[in-house]
């Protein structure tokens, strides 16, 4: 029963041009996104099975990649098709598509950026189902929040791979 249950709950994800079961997708431990947080990401909401503001997210993705000098290995149209296909394959009516592009996986860990002509970026997309958000009390009434100062740059004493 455990194997059947696990199989039924498995999502389809996208990794470097191919679709995989989430349990089958593999990323190198030398990927700079993993070792150095050298990556960009976008999250596109899905409502009624449709992507919300895909163009805005794609434009920001391209700007972010340009700013970090990471080559974009996938065209706007191809990326849109991947988003739509993941929504379809995973039967997402309400949820999100998470996208991350890293500088890739050179053969060794190094602080020097790898030559973009020698190292391909890693492209990962997956979905998350978030049913009920649009009709939730929070969506209708809003949320109470508390804001705090962002102290990440003030904590350079912590050797974290994240910002």
What are these regions (language model features)?
Residues 71-73, 89-100, 134-135:
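Short secondary-structure capping/junction motifs at helix and strand boundaries
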Residues 75-84, 94-110:
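Short, glycine/charge-rich beta-strand/loop segments that flank catalytic centers
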């Amino acid at each position: 029963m455990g194997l059947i249950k696990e199989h039924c709950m498995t999502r389809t994800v996208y990794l470097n041009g191919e679709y995989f079961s989430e349990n089958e997708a593999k990323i190198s431990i030398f990927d700079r996104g993993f070792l150095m947080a050298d990556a960009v990401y976008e999250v596109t909401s899905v409502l009624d099975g449709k992507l919300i503001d895909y163009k805005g997210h794609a434009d920001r993705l391209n700007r972010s990649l340009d700013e970090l000098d990471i080559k974009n290995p996938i065209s706007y149209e191809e990326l849109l098709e991947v988003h739509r296909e993941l929504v379809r394959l995973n039967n997402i009516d309400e949820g999100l598509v998470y996208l991350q592009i890293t500088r890739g996986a050179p053969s060794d860990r190094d602080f020097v950026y790898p030559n973009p002509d020698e190292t391909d970026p890693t492209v990962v997309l997956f979905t998350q189902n978030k049913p009920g958000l649009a009709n939730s009390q929070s969506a209708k009434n809003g949320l109470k929040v508390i804001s705090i100062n962002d102290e990440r740059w003030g904590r350079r004493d912590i050797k974290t791979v994240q910002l």
